[in-house]
Amino acid sequence: MDKPVVRISVRNLVEFILRSGDLDNRGGSSDREAMQKGSRLHRKIQGRMGSHYRAEVSLKYKTEYEDVSIQVEGRADGIFTEDGQCWIDEIKGVYADVSQLEKPVKVHRAQAMCYAWIYAQEQKPEKIGVQMTYGNLDTEELKFFREEYTLEELGLWYQNLLDRYHKWIAYQLAWKKERNASMSDLEFPFEYREGQRKIVSGVYHTISTGRQIFVQAPTGVGKTMSTIFPAVRAVGAGLGENIFYLTAKTITRTVAEEAFSILKEHGLKFKVITITAKEKLCFCDKTECNPENCLWARGHLDRVNDAVFELWTTQDSYDRDTLLEHAKKWQVCPFEMCLDLAVWVDAVICDYNYVFDPNVYLKRFFGEGTSGEYIFLIDEAHNLVDRGREMYSAHVDRADVLEAKRLAGDYSKGLVRALEKVNRQLRTLEKECTEYEILPNPGAVSLGMLQVMGEMDKLLEELHGKELPEQLLEFYFCVRDFLNIDELLDENYVVYTEMGEGGKVILRLFCVNPAANIHRCLEKGKSAVFFSATLLPMDYYRALLSTRKDDYGIYVTSPFRQENRCILTGRDVSSRYTRRGYEEYHRIASYIARTVWTRKGNYMVFFPSYKFMEDVLEVYENEFSAEWVRCISQTSGMNEREKEEFLEEFSASEGTLVGFCVMGGIFSEGIDLMGEKLIGAIIIGTGLPQIGTEREILRQYYDKKGVNGFDYAYRYPGMNKVLQSAGRVIRTQEDTGIILLLDERFTGKDYRNLFPAEWSDRGNCTLNTVEEQLGSFWNRIREKN
């Protein structure tokens, strides 16, 4: 049997094995201007060296181990001969004053040494030299560092470097054999529910063919296990490399962790990590990742490889508590250790942004030029539309530019000049803007922001180790975001200006259709599964989440008996803005009262906004309160503890509890209140988003595309919130409950066409008949039991 071949670039090898020192995020990033300047500087230096200088020489060398071949490859910046001596040149562009550099950076020297060793295998010289050339990106001033090595010295050094890397590869290969063997008899851990087998086979086939699939399956089918199980089997069969389970909310990450745990209880060996937000993993009050403010950042790079290797080789599940405990033991940053460990595991559970967000994505997996046989399982995929628009949009506010200019005065005249230029450009746009103004492109602002970024990067490098005002640093990230999105502008964007609250103009790059950007990310892997209980209408979600024409689609009907739940539409009530007022609030409050009086138990009432909820709640408490009914309400900005306390009320309640909530909020999706914990959901209105600039831009954009702009901007997003809220009731085969839709618009064809197939038994009611109809349903349930 042939040995596997592992390929790694020279740069990745030395930056992984030889990294050392502190973690420090105070330096600048590689912005477009710096990269362009660096490329120009490389070409200039290479051009000056004469005909004897060979630039960009491709080199590779394979080293044989008993279990694996490791091929190290890359391109040397330059190779030349001087006085009979061969030299390998490594060129680095920096903003720092090169005259102040005392010695080359360790990993830069190591890159040159690797190239020297590989090149020497062909030429066999007695000695070979390495030259580190540092050039200032602005002044183009150069400084050279030279060192000579014998072939024996280089050989010993290179072998030691590769042996340290081989340790990781050897364990990885041994683990994969053990992992794959554990799957030989792995079966689905439960008796298949109706629809589950259809999902499992559909997902496995999709992965095996390298395609994408959209799975619409109602709450309670068991979508999590039905997608994870076939993905795991596909990895074991060599059809995929890593699983990325992507979620929008913390609670769905927990469900995924539980699914993997159940499979492990049935014999699966699989390493699974959950990436938690940096703020939730940080030991410090503020996430200031530098050696002055964080003990864990000090010397982090000296210790992190040993920390990761120990955790990786001794455990298989890595949740927040495990990561924090291990990071404390090794005195390293838990978040950075988590990201490093993620490279070596079998499955990563994380938020959408670690794959899709251009500012946050895992560069270890999805950086430029990197890809793999990744399987993407995208949970609650309906959320990815708005999240995608948010991740791929950016803005610059003239008020922020002026504040940054004020703060920059103490640091850099060049930055002040660049900011004033952008300010003038925005002021010109401001004069032409009333409510909002659609533009063909950002115009000169893009170039101005590029110059600002260059000046800020220069400043950050010069100030290395010193603090900048927090507001100025935040503006730096705003500029970076703007430039990243500016590169993506195409027909899927609308560029527009609007007036901010402070009377200053805001220039926005608004992604109206995120499908192309999402597609570019998913192309880094092999296959993707989009699944949700509310992917209706499926064509809408396909249009906004995928550009492929060959995607599969599966519709799974509810496995639960229709007779266990009652769905009614109140046809004499409305939540339209034109109807809002005491009379309608009183009617809605009366509906709520008559519903909860019909049977003792727990109910949730979902409103389109906090204001609407508060207005109806006030009427309800003043005119319909009863001793045996207790009301609680969702508040804006609830933290995790408050959210848990709210949900605990539904477990502890023995009488009748009514939770007043907001559609599209934290209680309208991703929560499990089974059995008697929740027996009814009352949904007020059609969930239409509030009319605003971006919604109107969406409506106009899709009207021009020849589809119904109102549907795309308002009706479909609103109906999704309705379906999610309704999905809180009936979570298991034994559950019984009612769903009450309070808005006359639900009786119209435009909305009826959006109802899932299992709502075919939906009936209509009025305020005068609702008690009788619900009472009849509950009597049937009592008689059956």
What are the residue ranges of the model-derived segments?
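Metal-dependent nuclease catalytic cores that hydrolyze phosphodiester bonds in DNA/RNA
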Residues: 1-85, 110
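Mg2+/Mn2+-dependent nuclease catalytic core
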Residues: 61-155
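Conserved pre-motif I regulatory segment
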Residues: 174-216
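A substrate-engagement module of RecA-like helicase motors
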Residues: 186-187, 239-348, 356, 424-428, ...
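Walker A/P-loop
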Residues: 208-230, 242
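Signature of the SF2 helicase/ATPase Hel1-core->accessory helical subdomain module
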Residues: 227, 254, 328-347, 351-456, ...
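A contiguous, basic/glycine-rich beta-loop/short-helix subdomain that forms a polymer-engagement track
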Residues: 323-348, 359-366, 458-574, 579, ...
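Conserved RecA-like P-loop NTPase helicase motor core
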Residues: 571-583, 635-746
